[in-house]
Amino acid sequence: MERQMEPCQLIERSIIKKYRKELWTPFIVAVKRYELVQAGDKIAVCISGGKDSMLMAKLMQELQRHSDVPFELVFLVMDPGYNEINRQKIESNAALLNIPITIFETDVFAVANNSDKSPCYLCARMRRGYLYKKAQELGCNKIALGHHFNDVIETTVMSMFYGSQLQAMPPKLHSTNFEGMELIRPLYLVREDDIKAWSCLLYTSDAADEARS
């Protein structure tokens, strides 16, 4: 008789089995092609609570589990001023996926809302700075962000039409403000539609059947 698998195990299995071609393969290609993970790295996987960062966290867990290269992971959640419902949702999804998150509070929303500058731009800048700082405090040398293939294309196209110069979103980037820190984007080759398809496993009652197929 087949042993009943837990929801988290089914979701993890789906990454390696059902969505191997769409998720696992492009993830591994990006990690190897751009040399995103090195022996001895301590990587802060930055989780916003959305589908992209949650998938990234599971992929990084699977990589650590199967890799011959030793490295450490910290799963970092910056609370910019979430309401209680949003924070609880992040915590419950992380628990479902067996992701041991570390949450730290900031005042990003409050500062951005009281600024004359674009709130979205300011939020993004402040968020990244806080993530770098906290990751460094925890002894990490890298932060991983959940930008995917479509984000990369959109950023490039937007800079062509609205920017004064062509700007790309590289797969890795050395920080100029935090010495010894590097930003990596493990989902660089993963497409948004495939992430959406996988994320349905978290919200449907047919997750077990989907993951086994």
Question: What does each model-found stretch correspond to?
Answer:
Residues 167:
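CoA-thioester-processing core
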Residues 203-211:
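Conserved small/polar residues in nucleotide/adenosyl-binding loops
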Residues 2-162, 170, 193-197, 201:
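ATP-dependent adenylation/nucleotidyltransferase module used to activate substrates
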Residues 138, 211-212:
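Generic hydrophobic alpha-helical segments
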Residues 171-190:
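Short, flexible loop segments at boundaries between secondary-structure elements
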